[in-house]
Amino acid sequence: MTLAFAPFDWSWLVYPLLAYLFYHWLRTDAFGAFIHVWLFSLGMRLTGICWIFFSLYFHGGSPAVFAVAIIVLLSAGLALFPATVAYLVTRYCRVNDLIRLLVVFPGTWLLAEWTVGITLTGFAWMQPGYTQIDWPLAGYAPVFGNHAVGGLIAVCAGALIAVMKNLMSWHKALILVGLIWGTGFALKQISWTEPAGEDIEVALIQGNIPQELKWKRHMHRSTLMTYRDLTLENKDVDLVIWPETAIPDYKHRVPAYLISLRQALRQSDTDLLVGLFIKDLDSGRYYNSVLSVNGGEYRKRHLVPLGEYIPLRSLIGFFNRWIDIPMSDIDSGPDDQALLVVAGQPVGVSICFEDIFSRDVRRDLPQATVLVNVSNDAWFDGSHESRQHHAIARMRALESGRYM
């Protein structure tokens, strides 16, 4: 299943693989359904999110066995959601096989994926809808969202098995799939939003500071100068954007640096969004943040468990003994934050994996006319994580009708 996602992009593969799952699901009892769906989901997630190993082992100093164990436990836990729903549906839902294939199984899969994204902190990563970003079904995303795209994939897969099991004639299945795809194609031709204001020119700055050096104190000045020089070389734009934690330090420790940047960019009337940490000097709490040098800031609301904070610290505090991730005791920002206004546009900002949650992006709409996501995917350098993240960002842009 992972091959259907970026960077492989064998998008067509999601249809026969879901059909294969539905075929075995249809033939078994409730316990068998649980096992089949759990194994299918486990395999998808083990191969799909194996990039977590890169951050834990190469950059977090974790023993390899511990890093692998974390990935296996996370994947196994996430796989329980669709498996449990499959068990309950198979045991208690008494309908004919055609309805099961076209309605019950797709609805069950959709419900399970939605549940994975909202339970505890949520981890809405390997969702089938992301495989269709360049396909006709993506036309449904601006109207119904990514989950609907995944549900329609499942309906098409169910129709394939219905034909194989002689529950539906091939021409009826072709009409059904044709209507789904044709409607998606038609919806994709519609522009659901209109331009607001003048076009703005944006420069994205990437300092390419190796992750293993980024947090070293001797690299601090070099990092600041690298970003300053790159910015001044590209200042003839409306907006410059730096990555997440481009400055690996607190805002209150670099005031002169930020002031000098604002002054240097004033003549060209350029705004700058900077990724760094902001510390509340009264409470001692600190936040993964983005600020505009011309005023305004955003503090990350949806934190990464085990990376930015330790959930259930009293129970799993031992985690800190096995892994060393810098700045991993961060606080979440308030829900009701004002939008940043940069280059004359209200901007919806997200940091790192916040953009995998469509509900988090939607709360800045419709006021935000532009979406900005800043990330430090160097934690996963050498893996396919950044390509998967890029596909997810494209889906958020498609859903919202905004550039990201």
Which residues are covered by each model-predicted region?
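Soluble catalytic domains of enzymes that build or remodel membrane lipids, polysaccharides, and related
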Residues: I190-M404
